[in-house]
Amino acid sequence: MFLGEYEHTVDEKGRLAIPAKFRAGLAEGLVLTRGFDQNLLLYPMPVWRELAARINALPITQPSARNLRRLMFAGASDLGLDKQGRIVLPPNLRQYATITNQAVVTGMDSFIEIWSAERWQTVLDSFADEAPALAEHVSAFGI
């Protein structure tokens, strides 16, 4: 389970430290890909395989299914942690997420999001305005 948020420096080689408490959940390998909100998504390999199977089950005749495949698979990278618990963020993914020297790693239970520090702050700032509507919306789900 991945929980919490952590700000880390991205070095000149694009290396980002993954929080120590997240590393055991990534021991079987991981996949990094584009997210839906100008962020990156980091999946443990078992979760990625399940997600990929579900995406591949979507009919290729639907434009939205093709676009989802492009978003999730075209930029994806199969990665591993180095001895210091870091991953290398590929240049194309750093550019997509506008990550330069600071990144925020956030736990999303079964996967991890990686944000530029600036973009994450914008997301946090938007919560103040959106929280009441979100609370009302999720109440329909018994949350």
UniProtKB/Swiss-Prot annotation:
Residues 5-47, 76-119 form the SpoVT-AbrB domain. GO terms for biological process: negative regulation of DNA-templated transcription initiation. Its main location: cytoplasm. It comes from the Bacteria. GO terms for molecular function: DNA-binding transcription factor activity; transcription cis-regulatory region binding. InterPro entries: MraZ, MraZ_C, MraZ_dom, MraZ_N, MraZ_sf, SpoVT-AbrB_dom, SpoVT-AbrB_sf. Pfam families: MraZ. It is found in: Cytoplasm, Nucleoid. The keyword Cytoplasm applies. GO terms for cellular component: cytoplasm; nucleoid. Signal peptide: none annotated. Keywords: Cytoplasm, DNA-binding, Repeat, Transcription, Transcription regulation. The keyword DNA-binding applies. PANTHER family: TRANSCRIPTIONAL REGULATOR MRAZ. Forms oligomers. Belongs to the MraZ family. HAMAP family: MraZ. This is Transcriptional regulator MraZ. It comes from Herpetosiphon aurantiacus (strain ATCC 23779 / DSM 785 / 114-95). The gene is mraZ.
